[in-house]
UniProtKB/Swiss-Prot annotation:
Residues recorded as bearing O-(pantetheine 4'-phosphoryl)serine in the entry: S44
PTM notes: 4'-phosphopantetheine is transferred from CoA to a specific serine of apo-ACP by AcpS. This modification is essential for activity because fatty acids are bound in thioester linkage to the sulfhydryl of the prosthetic group.
Domain of life: Bacteria
InterPro entries: ACP, ACP-like_sf, PP-bd_ACP
Entry protein name: Acyl carrier protein
Gene: acpP
Length: 92
């Protein structure tokens, strides 16, 4: 469960972004612990599109090897919370 209002907001924004990015997916279908591949049917192309949308929306860079390890919506939201809180030039 997200521990702060900011994390909850990130989770909600991420769910909206996922629904907008992945064809035939609605916000209602996306739970915090949904697996991108197993539960939501996100294939490799959709994952690339999602990562690009995340990078554009939050102005961060998500290295491919890191993106590959983020398999649930909650994991992505946690990574985003760390990345947007990190000072410019810091590691996330």
């Amino acid at each position: 469960m997200p521990s702060t209002a900011d994390e909850r907001q990130l989770l909600d924004e991420l769910r909206d972004l996922l629904a907008a990015t992945v064809e035939d997916l609605t916000v209602e279908e996306i739970g915090p612990d949904s697996s991108l591949q197993d539960d939501l049917g996100v294939d490799s192309l959709a994952r690339l599109e999602l990562v690009a949308a995340i990078e554009d929306r939050w102005q961060i860079e998500v290295p491919q090897e890191q993106a590959d390890r983020l398999t649930t919506v909650r994991q992505i939201a946690a990574h985003l919370a760390e990345a947007v809180a990190a000072p410019a030039g810091g590691t996330a």
